[in-house]
Amino acid sequence: LRITKSFKIMKSSVIIFPGSNCDRDMDVALKKFGFKNQMVWHNDAKIPKSDLIVLPGGFSYGDYLRCGSIAGKSKIIKSVIDFANSGGLVLGICNGFQILTETGLLPGILQQNKYLNFICKNVFVKIKNKENKYFKKIKKEILELHIAHNEGNYFCSMDELKSIEDNGQIAVTYCDHKGNEDEKNNPNGALKNIAGIFNKDKNILGMMPHPERMIDPFL
């Protein structure tokens, strides 16, 4: 995965929760692309001045109750919500996506995978909307990314789905290497093959695949 280094965003903050395990990978990825990254503990009240906040993957609080439910009520989340509501960029990867739905910053929920199994493999995804700061510099439409989750089955009400589709909020969908979106290329049973979504303003992005794992052979 190659990302053009023309972003003017230079300061990022990765939030660490008990059970996070992709925070260091994200730190490596952000620094590789020129970000001055800061690691922020979940119990801090405020986030340092940032252009981008990242909620990383992992198993925050051991995934007790529901994935992301306890993290969604942690001390730092108010600052994340305030930052997002002011137009700041917030990215949630895997467990971070689950946290964003738990806080209400993104619509829908992430359910247990269709076949009740943990999935760990590479998949292809199609970028559905490039009119945003996350994907506008990526030339490819189809990307190969890694997934590792037990609860990645995206679901929302039919009214929410219509709103999401009408507003161009579907960010990425599961597909094959040619871009075909169908059931056999849907690893977890997600509604409409959805792998990631935006909020209405496109400043918040949640996605189950891990782009940070594809930027360096070591990761």
Question: Which residue ranges define each predicted feature?
Answer:
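N-terminal beta1-alpha1 cap of cysteine-dependent amidohydrolase-like domains
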Residues: 1-93, 99-107, 113-119, 126, ...
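Amide-donor transfer/coupling interface in amidating biosynthetic enzymes
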Residues: 11, 81-85, 110-219
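Short, flexible active-site-adjacent loop segments at beta-strand->alpha-helix junctions, enriched
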Residues: 96-97, 131
